[in-house]
Amino acid sequence: MMSLSVRPQRRLLSARVSRSQSFAGVLGSQERGPRNFTVFSPPGPQRKPLVLSRVSRMFSVAHPAPKVPQPERLDLVYAALKRGLTAYLEVHQQEQEKLQRQIKESKRNSRLGFLYDLDKQVKSIERFLRRLEFHASKIDELYEAYCVQRRLRDGAYNMVRAYSTGSPGSREARDSLAEATRGHREYTESMCLLENELEAQLGEFHLRMKGLAGFARLCVGDQYEICMKYGRQRWKLRGRIESSGKQVWDSEETVFLPLLTEFLSIKVTELKGLANHVVVGSVSCETKDLFAALPQVVAVDINDLGTIKLSLEVIWSPFDKDDQPSAASTVNKASTVTKRFSTYSQSPPDTPSLREQAFYNMLRRQEELENGTAWSLSSESSDDSSSPQLSGTARYSSTPKPLVQQPEPLPVQVTFRRPESLSSGSMDEEPPLTPALVNGHAPYSRTLSHISEASVDAALTEAMEAVDLKCPAPGPSPLVYPESTHVEHVSSVPPVADNGRSATSPALSTAGPAPTFIDPASSTQLDLVHKATDSGSSELPSITHTMASSTYSAVSPINSVPGLTSTTVGSTHKPMPSPLTSTGSIPSVTDSIQTTTSPTHTTPSPTHTTVSPTHSTPSPTHTTVSPSNAALSPSNATPSLSHSTTSPTQKATMSTHTTSAVGPVQTTTSPISTTVSPSPSVDTAIISSSSAVPSVPGPEARPCSHPTSTPYTKADPTAACTSSPSLASSGPKPLTSPAPDSLEQILKSPSSSPSSIVPEPQRSELSLALVAQAPVPEATGGAGDRRLEEALRTLMAALDDYRGQFPELQGLEQEVTRLESLLMQRQGLTRSRASSLSITVEHALESFSFLNDDEDEDNDSPGDRPTSSPEVVAEERLDSSNAQCLSTGCSALDATLVQHLYHCSCLLLKLGTFGPLRCQEAWALERLLREARVLQEVCEHSKLWGNAVTSAQEVVQFSASRPGFLTFWDQCTEGLNPFLCPVEQVLLTFCSQYGARLSLRQPGLAEAVCVKFLEDALGQKLPRRPHSGPGEQLTIFQFWSYVEVLDSPSMEAYVTETAEEVLLVQNLNSDDQAVVLKALRLAPEGRLRKDGLRALSSLLVHGNSKVMAAVSTQLRSLSLGPVFRERALLCFLDQLEDEDVQTRVAGCLALGCIKAPEGIEPLVYLCQTDTEAVREAARQSLQQCGEEGQSAHRQLEESLDALPCLFGPSSMASTAF
């Protein structure tokens, strides 16, 4: 039994029903009789039951084709579908081999009908397996075509944005823009059509109602209605609890067509009377986990507490009902042979008939084709009968003659986990992860026989996986080809698959436009190569021999080279010699092995062989893996290609070659070491950027100078890649340059290397703390200076997405364009917008470079393709590093602008909020207007960019006299550049200046006041614990823009007022009731700012009755003042958008206390969408908002039965009962 992952929706009502009878069972189909009602049938006389089938199909209306493609969702469904198809193949292959073994083990006294029945089932399963393989290949073709269209669409999007950002005026540019737009639309339509076609290949879900289960919830006479919605498909059924405790339902089964983008919505209603129904619960369930080979019994929690569960039996069929093969149910049903076995007589026949002899002759020929086992017509029984029988070898052996010498394999049980007997000693072995066979139906789970060794694929698989099995002594092991077709297939090395995970042979190193899907469970496979060498040196000879005997079972044309490159795995073990000999067309490799050594000890290891479902394929291109060279990022689980060293006499061929097969990598022979890590995670990029990009200037004064671009002259140009302008270290990820789906797209062409492409950031939700951690680049040229240019492109691309939606952003857009033009003029770049447009278009055209790679793959083989020369690669990197970057002439000012530009990009992500909750959006627009003023101030002083700045007064001036503030900033930046100041320095300066005076009021008050000042100025919460890497920094413009909007006339007045507010908040949060009540009585209206109002609202939730009454009275009295009421209204409405549930509850209760009619619409919205606690508080507040609020509450209650809930709590999960 398994539990279906639930995406719960909001409950319509909080119905509390207390009863005392538990669920007593589910009525079986035999006891229910032939009762069947049509879906959505009204109460009344029963309709005539269907004669042909009891299953009703719920897809009379076709599902509409999507208008917007969803590639991320399709990737998830495709991976689940592949796992399900692989499970189907494995289960039926095991069933087929079980039947074949029954045929081989049959005695001569078995009658013809028994063997004929077995053979008929084997043939039926073979046809079904061929059908499954064809179906899987068709799905793979659709997915590959979809991936091609996706990449073409991304490239067209880059072209459209490249042409639109430049605002070209020529006719040719307008025509090009129109053509790119038309191409983007066509690719989008193609993706939608392919999604629809792939959706048609998902098969069917057969759902069978098992019943409701609930402890102390179900009573005799209760009637329930269950409505399931899956896209446009519906299934509504009604049932009741009878006196015996059994359940009777008017509909038993249905069929749903799987959908890509829809979730299964289940709503359970208790029918109490005429138009008096109580909604028990409504949930949405994920259906991608239902692609399994065996039936599954799933349990879904209907209500919040899980006291009501819906039990369904789900059977997935990979084909439609109209096109269902006859052998689809052979595994799920009892074998026909088992049923008929008792009907056959066990007495031996006297004389075999001609029909029997022909049948045995057919079996003999088939056996000879498989493994050369001969049939004998000689009688070996005691009754001297002439009935044909198996020879002694085939008759008395439980398994056929093995192709690879190894003991009898252990049986494999189809369960959630692999058998524990498979150790982790092998190099190719996987960790104990969830296998492709996903099933949780206990009655159907059984022990299936192991895959027969008569198959070469099974033999090779066992040779690579069963490391703990005892292997024979090393020596030549001649192999027998079971079929002649295997040798013919080896010449064309196809992609291989292993356990449901796609892999690619090294012979196809430039494989296909479609990226290989990376299973989440396979992200740690590269570490297994290192762990495999630590399992003990005694296992290495056994592994080596097993791999050798299985590797040379086929001949590859690539092996025609005179030498054979050996594989070396860096390890701490001593070198273990492993002689590999082979007979046949492959020469001996004892004298021609080329050893590639690593900095650590070297251990020769066997050839890594990939196994395809139909034949074996040796891999002549071997892997060189070293713990000191091969790096794997632990956060993003993306293998990074490391140092590849060549010599005139020896070459090390590197390729990513694991069972997950992230992607084939082109052979690297350049002496220049390369480190490629596509799409790194934010945390990893930040940690690594501390060594690549210099940090804040030191205590000594550093004059601002023009940056000089110097080429990289280090022997290890890895820094050119690691310190390249990566926006992941301080801002959003690239948007225009989509991350390649495999490493081969990066290594294949130098034009797509990270050092030559300046990616443009994506709109991804990042915390503001990461933006504030942007380190200051030195004025030494190189990749660090490109951060300003990247930040400009990021913000301009984000502003293009919001163009025309918010008029407030027009000023910010003008200032960004003005800043870009001033920077270009300062660098002496006289290029026009059209010329810069051509460069942008040139970068966008690189999105289509994979089309040329596909043509090269069709024309040339991987072995014949020349690699890029080291001189060309070095020259291109020097050219890219020598490119002149945008800069103001001062590295500190550049870093300041970068921080502001990225802050603007993050603020833009808060715009476009759905629903009536718009406080965060209004706050973001206000901050963006302040950032526009900052950019305006910077642009107005562009003539002074190159001058040395020593004080804050040379940079900013307040509109009104505010003594003390600029002096305080100069004290903070003493010895530093005045543009930037670390927050730690601000805190130290503040405590040294005001700590003595504030500590008289309360110890630690100075730190609390300074932290509040920094958080308000930065617009984010500061971390309470120190962390590694560069800390947050406050710019002079953030300091200036925050002080401009303050009401305090001087620094001294601000410190005094803020200290009073901090003390008030601390008293309100005190655990002493007397302190809280005293603070409420003495709280003046002016000191209740945002933090004080939040503290008051929290008392409405966590305080006792006396404190809650005092808070309500205080809020009602203070809300009479218009200034306080406006401030409190904005604060409490902002709390409704907080992530914390208790904060939202407090905001709802506080809005009820001040009786704000402005909050009626947000409160109604929360009643429909939020959790139960928030909905209850919102209803209570609506009733306190006068007549208008009470009317809205009545309308809400009346519409609860008709309006479905929109969202659900993400913390809820279903449990199996």
From Swiss-Prot:
Signal peptide: none annotated. It comes from the Eukaryota. Residues 371-413, 565-762, 850-874 are annotated as: Disordered. Residues 83-112, 786-828 form a coiled coil. This is Rho family-interacting cell polarization regulator 1. The gene is Ripor1. Residues 376-391, 400-413, 595-649, 664-695 have a biased composition (Low complexity). Residues 852-861 have a biased composition (Acidic residues). GO terms for molecular function: 14-3-3 protein binding. The keyword Coiled coil applies. Keywords: Coiled coil, Cytoplasm, Golgi apparatus, Phosphoprotein. InterPro entries: ARM-like (IPR011989), ARM-type_fold (IPR016024), FAM65_N (IPR031780), RIPOR3 (IPR026136). Residues 579-594, 650-661, 720-729 have a biased composition (Polar residues). GO terms for biological process: cellular response to starvation; establishment of Golgi localization; positive regulation of cell migration; positive regulation of intracellular protein transport; protein localization to Golgi apparatus; response to wounding; Rho protein signal transduction. GO terms for cellular component: cytoplasm; Golgi apparatus; membrane. Downstream effector protein for Rho-type small GTPases that plays a role in cell polarity and directional migration. Acts as an adapter protein, linking active Rho proteins to STK24 and STK26 kinases, and hence positively regulates Golgi reorientation in polarized cell migration upon Rho activation. Involved in the subcellular relocation of STK26 from the Golgi to cytoplasm punctae in a Rho- and PDCD10-dependent manner upon serum stimulation. The modification Phosphothreonine is found at T351. The modification Phosphoserine is found at S22, S345, S347, S452, S455, S742, S868, S869. Belongs to the RIPOR family. It is found in: Cytoplasm; Golgi apparatus. Interacts (via N-terminus) with RHOA (GTP-bound form); this interaction links active RHOA to STK24 and STK26 kinases. Interacts with RHOB. Interacts with RHOC. Interacts (via C-terminus) with PDCD10; this interaction occurs in a Rho-independent manner. Interacts (via C-terminus) with STK24; this interaction occurs in a PDCD10-dependent and Rho-independent manner. Interacts (via C-terminus) with STK26; this interaction occurs in a PDCD10-dependent and Rho-independent manner. Interacts (via N-terminus) with 14-3-3 proteins; these interactions occur in a Rho-dependent manner.
